[in-house]
Amino acid sequence: GILDVAKTLVGKLRNVLGI
């Protein structure tokens, strides 16, 4: 669902930022 997609995008961003 949309929440799953949002969580995936946030996870990718966090990995890229190294947070």
Curated annotation (Swiss-Prot):
Tissue specificity statement from the Swiss-Prot or TrEMBL entry: Expressed by the skin dorsal glands.
One GO CC term on file: extracellular region
Keyword RNA-binding included in the entry's annotation: no
The protein, known as: Uperin-2.8
GO biological process, alphabetically ordered: defense response
Record's signal peptide: none
Organism: Uperoleia mjobergii
Keywords of this entry: Amphibian defense peptide, Secreted
Described function: Shows antibacterial activity against B.cereus, L.lactis, S.epidermidis and S.uberis.
Subcellular location field: Secreted
UniProt superkingdom: Eukaryota
